[in-house]
């Protein structure tokens, strides 16, 4: 028996993909549907898919700025209905925005201990399906953490 699990990319601060937008929910649903159709009838295959809507919410909460507190106020006052709270607030900017290298990121006020230049280079490698060399903490100080 083989299990395939697919989940949407949730770009998060402090990672090389912090500059990357989340893929549109509609597009993710179509892709997951195509995979289901292509592989769904294979014997001994189990598939699971992460929720694009949950990924959207996670992306907003991780990439949002101070205005996220308004979302939470709405969410807490409406019976914990995330869908209607998201609809009330303009959050697409935080979810679908492609940031550039020189853009100010809402989470830049937090000192993560690394240099953004290192993460940017790693992001560029990732876009090209490149690999990041193994870190030898005894000799390497590229990221700025060690």
Predicted feature locations:
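Short helix/loop capping segments that flank catalytic or ligand/cofactor-binding pockets
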Residues: 14-15, 118
């Amino acid at each position: 028996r083989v299990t395939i699990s697919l989940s949407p990319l949730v770009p998060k601060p402090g990672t090389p993909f912090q500059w990357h937008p989340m893929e549109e929910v509609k597009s993710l649903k179509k892709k997951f549907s195509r995979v289901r159709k292509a592989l769904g009838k294979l014997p001994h295959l189990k598939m699971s898919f992460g929720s694009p809507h949950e990924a959207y919410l996670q992306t907003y909460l991780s990439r949002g700025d101070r205005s996220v507190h308004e979302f939470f106020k709405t969410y807490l006052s409406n019976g914990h209905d995330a869908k209607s709270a998201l609809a009330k607030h303009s959050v697409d900017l935080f979810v679908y925005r492609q940031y550039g290298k020189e853009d100010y990121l809402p989470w830049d006020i937090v000192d993560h201990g690394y240099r953004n230049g290192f993460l940017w280079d790693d992001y560029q490698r990732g876009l090209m399906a490149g690999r990041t060399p193994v870190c030898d903490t005894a000799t390497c100080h590229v990221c700025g953490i060690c």
